[in-house]
């Protein structure tokens, strides 16, 4: 069975020591969804929201969140990210927004949490900007799509 890396022999949480690991190129992609009424989504698509461009704001929020993941999640390392990309896609056929994030660096630890945080905070930002119009939006699912680099190897979700 695989061991939990953030738990020591005494069962205590600790930050993993990555100092002996080799620097490798690491990348992770994650996605999140925000379901909403067709009228709320139309307001976003048409750009008629009184707070401004919802997608631009969510994109910037996701990028900022990826860079601050280590401040939000206690055992994450501060990372020198070399790429953070957040793409937002309106999906009117499903009354939702799909968010996909991608994070990359050359370093000793992976960027899965940064990608997940970027997608999550972008979704939360959409909710925040639109809650005056609709409070029952649904955020989720949020998941890791893929990761590459590092000792544990590559991962890609099955389509």
UniProtKB/Swiss-Prot annotation:
Q: Where are the transmembrane segments?
A: none
Q: In which pathway does it act?
A: Cofactor biosynthesis; molybdopterin biosynthesis
Ranked from the top, the taxonomy reads: Bacteria, Pseudomonadati, Pseudomonadota, Gammaproteobacteria, Enterobacterales
GO molecular-function terms, A-Z: cyclic pyranopterin monophosphate synthase activity
What is the protein name stated in its UniProt record? Answer: Cyclic pyranopterin monophosphate synthase
Q: Name one GO biological process term.
A: Mo-molybdopterin cofactor biosynthetic process
The top EC class is lyase
Its family remark reads: Belongs to the MoaC family.
UniProt-annotated binding residues for substrate:
75-77, 113-114
NCBIfam families attached here?
A: moaC (TIGR00581), PRK09364.1 (NF006870)
Keyword Transcription assigned to the entry: answer is no
Enzymatic reactions? (8S)-3',8-cyclo-7,8-dihydroguanosine 5'-triphosphate = cyclic pyranopterin phosphate + diphosphate
The cross-references to CDD domains, in alphabetical order and at most eight, read: MoaC_PE (cd01420)
Sorted UniProt keywords: Lyase, Molybdenum cofactor biosynthesis
Q: Which EC numbers does the record give?
A: 4.6.1.17
Which branch of life, at top level?
A: Bacteria
Assembly and oligomerization: Homohexamer; trimer of dimers.
Q: Which organism is it from?
A: Yersinia enterocolitica serotype O:8 / biotype 1B (strain NCTC 13174 / 8081)
| Cited PANTHER family | MOLYBDOPTERIN COFACTOR SYNTHESIS PROTEIN A
